[in-house]
Amino acid sequence: MKWRKGIKKVAGFVLAGILAVGIMGCQGSQEEEEILTICVDSGTEGIGSMIADGWSNLNEGMKTDLVVIPADETAAQAKIKELRTEIMSGGGPDVFLLSADSNQRLFEDPKKTMYSDTFLPLDDYMSDAKHMKPEEWNQTVLESGRTEEGQVVLPVLYSYYAFAFQTSRLENPGEIPSSLEEIFACEDPLIGEYVAYFPYFAMLYSFGELADYQEEKLICSEEDLLKRAEEMVAYKLKYPSKLPSNTEAEGIVAYGEADGTFFSNVDRFSGEEETVFAFPNDQGGVTAHVKMYAAINRNTELPDQAFAVLDFLLSNEVISGEGFPYGEDKWAGRSNRFFPGLGGISVNQTLAQEACRSQTAKDALKKMNSQITAVRYPSILDQEIQQLYKDCHLSELSGNGEYTNEAMRKELISRAYERMEMQLSE
């Protein structure tokens, strides 16, 4: 019977060896199949899908997977909670490509998150980039993604609040407002009506930097909020809303948050003289808002591959829509989703200039870019400012609300300011 036991023993060793080899083989195949995850929201899902597919085609053997924050509020909140838990536990997606304007934000205040060790510093990677050319980008906007650790966020699209008029329709074409004080003093009805039409945007863009995130304190004071609310409500009452049905006849060319469509309209009217300007802030310049940004999760185990995706995303070939050739008559990243800046202006100044067909549009873009003195990322602070204006304006119109009583008006401002301070310190 001993020989049977011996055979069983040998068979056991052989089986164990086979299983061990099988397990090692499975582990090896798992290690080879690396998957890079890219987190997107409803505002960036289209671009994210194009980037994921294009980059994967150029890098055979490397798979990408989109982690989507859905548009539905309930589903989005559940996904955001899940992602935040993963990130805090040392995991989470490798790459973030997010719309700063999304109502459902993974990072409620991206600028604040930059100081929380969430994002990977990118300077060393950028110095060895194969495709992106940061020297061609708007340096003021790019700098907004930098902390004492280095570049941690890459702005992709930005905008400012701007207007373009047919010069011949203005009452005093030689007196175009270039400061906040001049805006409030301007008596041109055409300018007044359009500046006042979206007063909550004007209120928002009238401030420069709102906070010092490193020191975790507000830069604007409670008195600043009160003064601006009073100025904007008075301005709105001076120019009631009544957009004309025929905007061309009224002399308006374009207005709102500047993007590719804004400058296309400027191009359309380039056969005649145009007056183009950005809404000024209280710091003597122009405030830009980042509309889309990209970053790498500090927890990623694939930092080189993660940066390669950003390098692809922000390459001239992808931003321009030209794409990269691969295979037989195939192109990675060839798309019209990204350019000429739908939803914002490309951080790549060179390509943004090339997208403008007329010299008028090129000059306007260059001038407004040169006036940027503050770059903000939409946050709860912005939401408080916009809501504050709405509350003050509605109260003024009602004639018996909080705003018409000076003490109650100050209390309204004070409560908003306290909420902003709490948000900054959390």
Predicted regions and their residues:
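Conserved N-terminal structural module of periplasmic/extracytoplasmic solute-binding proteins
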Residues: 2-4, 8-13, 20-108, 402-426
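Short helices/loops that flank or line small-molecule/ion binding pockets
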Residues: 77-92, 96, 107-112, 234-265
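Extracytoplasmic/periplasmic solute-binding protein
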Residues: 144, 148-163, 179-224, 246-255
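Extracytoplasmic/periplasmic substrate-recognition and gating elements
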Residues: 268-343
